[in-house]
């Protein structure tokens, strides 16, 4: 009996490292290291889907470079994922750019204007410091002046700008770009190590949320 017990103990001891390795493999990325847990989860727009929300700023060169990776990645997201963007608003100049984003969305020209606004600020070095400069950019790309002014100054756009600012603050965003997964997790280059890894961590967290919904 003693020999049997000793054999079982030896076998159990030998298997412990394998079990530990299996746990490590299952948790490919670690909270607090590769991503951050949002202390108080933020409600999502559609609880039936996994929300992915990029917090960005048109004046951020890192956000502009991230677009080349983010855009094709976002297009490949499955049907159970709701992809959103939230323009950051930390100071008055950023509010101008956020309102440009929501105005473009309201007018149905966001798909075209999103990259145009980025290019204007990052390559052409336009400050887009006020409404008139935003209006001029839109008019130069085919939007009627009356339409863009009406949208930019609308209650809806102003409300969305305030709500987006509040949402980003609730996420605890530290910089741009950051990706928020289902209002629960925050992914940044600082934690993930690179923009490429941000998307890998995001994929991991999307899968994590999907498995939790089953």
Listing of model-derived features with the role each one plays in the protein:
Residues 5, 140-214:
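C-terminal cap of thioredoxin/glutaredoxin-like
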Residues 76-107, 111-139:
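Structural microenvironment flanking redox-active thiols in thiol-disulfide oxidoreductases
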Residues 2-92, 170, 207-214:
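Extracytoplasmic thiol/disulfide redox context detector
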Residues 67-74, 97-101, 114, 131, ...:
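Extracytoplasmic/secreted envelope proteins and their assembly/folding machinery
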Residues 64-67, 94-98, 192-195:
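Conserved strand-to-helix beginnings and helix N-cap segments that scaffold or border functional pockets
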Residues 59-62, 89-93, 119-124, 154-157, ...:
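Solvent-exposed loop/turn segments at secondary-structure junctions
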Residues 56-59, 70, 74-77, 104-108, ...:
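Sec/Tat-exported extracytoplasmic proteins
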